[in-house]
A protein has these predicted regions:
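Hydrophobic h-region of N-terminal signal peptides that target proteins for export
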Residues: 8-17
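Sec-dependent signal peptide recognition
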Residues: 2-8
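Initiator methionine at the very start of the polypeptide chain
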Residues: 1-2, 17-18
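Gram-negative and organellar
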Residues: 18-37, 41, 50-670
């Protein structure tokens, strides 16, 4: 399955290569700063105004870009340095910020250091997330939340042989969201409910690092705490709105807190010698999780009679996790390297839960559930790298993994004697793979790599797990002072046994070019092509009058993604800098022009066809101009266009939009 995700991540990496229009990467010159006692202070601030104009689906725009109007501190930097490196309380303070004020994506990085005594690093990020959810649940699922992430790390005696570490991290998410609840039975309608998202994660760290006799030993103690206290309520009285369903939801409340903790240990031993190296790591986490749910609903059922429903759920679980890695490296000669790595992991989850339900005065009883999941994995890999000559080298390896999964499922009905039932399932598999490659360097600036891998699994755990797979790939790169060129290709096949009827195939092409013939001109371009197709057997219940088993359909998903980036930079008489860029991502799908192929009369097949390919186009040209007013002041202006279009739309709902965004700012350095 991981091989299927590789093309998606590769395309995401290509899109990330495009520059954003603001803040400007240009600087205001080399500021000398101002003296303050034994310190020198330098500052740089870019303040400006953003604007945007959106047409089409504004919800999709907010989900993808989300830039609005208003004043911004687009970027800022502040630094204090000791003149002689021996300040009283600190020797260095640096602060860098981006998007503070009203941008949906904001960040700040702070560094404080006193040479040889302490080092403090802090990072803070804020991201406003909006998900309109209009393509599912009739538009009744959406989220408008903010996530704040911060990390703090303090190192005492950072340059000594014995160092001490303290750390703290925090991740919070809050904001309104909309969901649905089904009432008052399994055949009832779904009604909108409002939630107030409140999620929080905290981690505390302390540890030490020792250097002795060429070894580095690290030990760290961690405490992780997570809680989700998101309530849900209805907003007034909501009716089903159909003549055949008289259900009315008059009142709804749900409380579902989840609290967990994960204290753990981390130990690491590392050394690198002339002929050998060692890296050993051991981690243990003792996790525990407690949850409860109290839900009540009041109204009228589908037949017009008064109805009320109350559900109470509670439980707890333990999650111990042990993992160890040992990597040994051997360098008998300068041209030969052996690396062997052994990893062991043991994950377990077990706990009890209870479910009780009362429906319109009737006690439907209590059910007690027990679940246990244990996964033990052992992996070993040996890799050899041999450089036969300066221009040619070979590498190969053998990888082996053994996994065992055990599941216990049990339940009890306290109201009935001898109702306890336990089912135990055990399954395991072994994966063996071999890889080989050659590295060529016919001349100093040019390198070529070819590699391939073949893998076999005796017992895939799921229908989409790797069975018999093979990959082939190559990469060529040319690097000179003024030009850099690279191209790569990778192909992956995964064949399953005949009874699973699943297969997948992916191909990836990539090319990059960078050219800087003059100091005042540079060009960067990239192209990425990813093809993915997967085929699987489907079995489900559906029918116009009554549901029956449908076993004649297949899921065939086809994606053909083309992504390209182009950026050109001009420096005009050392007075101005102009950047022009263009980015496009286009998925052509399987090439069809309509949602369902011509002649499709089966309504189920037509529905499946509509979601088995998703052709779309996303493009974003931009232009940015930065003019130097004085050695310390620059005026900046930029424009960026976003265009998103779906050929079919998901379930006939189109989320197309186009947006014009831009900014103007002043950068001041001193």
């Amino acid at each position: 399955m991981s091989k299927l995700l590789l093309p998606i991540f590769a395309v995401a990496g290509t899109l990330a290569a495009q520059q954003v229009v603001a803040p400007t990467p240009e600087t205001g010159g080399s500021a000398r700063g101002d003296g303050w006692g034994d310190y020198n202070i330098t500052q740089s601030f870019e303040t400006g105004y953003r604007f945007h104009l959106v047409g089409g689906d504004t919800g999709e725009y907010r989900s993808d870009a989300n830039y609005g109007n208003g004043l911004r501190l687009l970027g800022g930097s502040f630094a204090i340095h000791s003149k002689d490196g021996h300040g009283k309380w600190f020797d260095e303070i640096t602060l860098n910020t981006s998007g503070l004020g009203n941008d949906p994506y904001q960040s700040a990085i702070l560094h404080v250091e006193k040479n040889g005594l302490y080092r403090y690093d802090m990072s803070w990020r804020l991201s406003d997330y909006f998900n309109p959810g209009l393509a599912v649940a009739g538009g009744e699922h959406l989220a408008d939340t903010s996530r704040r992430i911060q990390d703090h790390d303090l190192t005492l005696l950072p340059r000594s042989h014995m160092r001490f570490h303290l750390g703290y991290s925090r991740n919070t998410e809050d904001g309104p969201a909309l969901s649905t609840a089904q009432e008052f039975n399994l055949s009832g309608s779904a009604y909108p409910i409002f939630t107030n998202v409140r999620r929080q994660w905290n981690e505390y760290r302390m540890g030490a690092e020792a250097h002795f006799a060429g070894f580095q030993f690290t030990v760290e103690r961690r405490w992780d705490f997570f809680k989700d206290d998101t309530p849900a309520t209805s907003d007034g009285i909501v009716a089903a709105g159909t003549s055949s369903d008289l259900t009315v939801l008059q009142q709804f409340n749900r409380s579902q807190p989840v609290h967990g903790s994960s204290p753990g240990w981390l130990g690491n031993l590392h050394t690198r010698r002339k002929r050998w190296g060692l890296n050993a790591r051991l981690t243990y986490v003792s996790g525990r999780n407690d949850f409860a749910l109290d839900e009540s609903a009041l109204g009228v059922d589908q037949f017009g009679s008064p109805a009320n429903r109350q559900i109470v759920v509670g439980g707890d679980a333990s999650r111990p996790d042990l993992a160890g890695d040992l990597s040994l490296s051997y360098f008998p000669t300068d041209r030969l390297t052996f690396v062997n790595n052994t990893s062991i992991s043991n994950n377990r989850i077990d706990g009890d839960s209870t479910y009780s339900e009362f429906l319109t005065g009737s006690n439907l009883g209590t059910t007690i559930y027990f679940r246990y999941l244990g996964i033990r994995t052992i992996t070993n890999s040996t890799d050899v790298n041999y450089r036969l000559a300066d221009w040619i080298g070979f590498y190969g390896g053998y990888h082996y993994s053994d996994r065992r999964v055990e599941t216990v499922e049990g339940f009890t009905l306290p109201a009935f004697a001898n109702s306890t039932e336990n089912d135990v399932y055990q399954v395991g598999n072994q994966l063996q793979s071999g890889l080989a490659g050659v590295r060529l360097r016919p001349w100093k600036a040019f390198t070529v790599n070819f590699d391939g891998e073949i893998g076999r699994t005796n017992n895939p755990l799921t229908t989409i797990s790797d069975k018999n797979f093979q990959t082939l790939g190559g990469r060529a790169q040319y690097r000179a002072r003024k030009v850099q060129l690279s191209a790569s290709y990778r192909e992956s096949y995964d064949f399953q046994p005949a009874f699973s009827l699943f297969s997948s195939h992916s191909r990836g092409y990539n090319a990059n070019a960078s050219w800087a013939p003059r100091d005042w001109f540079s060009l960067d371009a990239s192209y990425n092509r990813q093809h993915l197709d997967s085929s699987s057997f489907l079995a489900f219940f559906a029918g116009a009058t009554r549901s029956t088993l449908q076993a004649k359909y297949r899921s065939i998903y086809v994606s053909n993604v083309h992504a390209a980036n182009l950026g050109v930079r001009f420096a005009i008489r050392r007075r101005a800098d102009l950047y022009l860029g263009y980015s496009i991502t286009k998925d052509t799908g399987d090439g069809r022009a309509t949602v369902a192929p011509a002649g499709t009369t089966d309504p189920i097949q037509a529905l499946l066809d509509s979601v088995q390919t998703f052709p779309l186009t996303y493009q974003s040209p931009l232009a940015r101009l930065s003019i130097r007013i004085s050695p310390k002041v620059r005026w900046n202006a930029g424009y960026q266009y976003y265009g998103y279009g779906e050929t079919f739309g998901l379930l006939s709902y189109y989320q197309n939009f186009h947006a014009h965004t831009g900014y103007t700012s002043v950068l001041w350095s001193f």
